[in-house]
């Protein structure tokens, strides 16, 4: 009886913890676009939304420079506690070098509808829906397409080839993406609870699978193994948010010898690989809970100012190799 009571209490605590994280909207607004156009006034944007399978409006933006020709379309999938503008300094650089960009807010984030963010696995559902909707736009159909994602978005771009996609994908860049929802929950839990985490992950996955039936048992390694796209996987050994070892333990046996997949590893770049992690990380850790406009504006300034231009240039070279 005591054990049964203990298990019920544990299940209740885990349920409350899970819903505390995912039964909410993310209202982050990071005004990166306003920061960028101070230096690049010709960088334009055009709002574009669609209605997803759950009858929620997914709000995105096309970002571009007026050009006679675009090398292709890059679809950006954002990370957790981020929004469609978080990666915009990098996306502007790609746009400046000939690409059309589409970036969107996930369900329950920013300007998109949805009463909550559903669950950790929902980012790949949002990406699949976005790809298949954009595939109906005649002007985009002849273009080559690339996927670009960090963290939650890195998982999405890696995993999405498990689904039926209505347009071919030529290139994928995944930065600090995790292999599966289970692996990510396990890694985050093990940092606090060690091996006891095994007791928690099963019930948490039960709640996750109740909310996202379409994503049950989906892994990035399966999507990457299936895709014909050329893939760049970037990850740092010291990533505190998405475990390097737990991810590569799944990736390497199946992907290391695939000609279309390139790995690029770092020793000390943390979770945000192509950013000056010292200034950005310090500021975010001090002000993560502050949503006032002046804090968000300063964070946006750092996102633009402290971008690692050399690493973003390497990403551009990868895109150009397979998109032009």
PLM regions and their residue ranges:
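Conserved alpha/beta-hydrolase "acid-adjacent" motif
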Residues: 240-246
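Short beta-strand/loop motif that positions the catalytic acidic residue
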Residues: 227, 233-239
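The serine-hydrolase catalytic nucleophile loop
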Residues: 80-93, 106, 245
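An N-terminal hydrophobic leader/cap segment in hydrolases
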Residues: 2-51, 58-63, 285-299
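C-terminal catalytic histidine-bearing segment of alpha/beta-hydrolase fold enzymes
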Residues: 258-324
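Conserved alpha/beta-hydrolase
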Residues: 91-113
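Hydrolase active-site cap/lid region
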Residues: 159-214
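Alpha/beta-hydrolase active-site loop
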Residues: 117-138
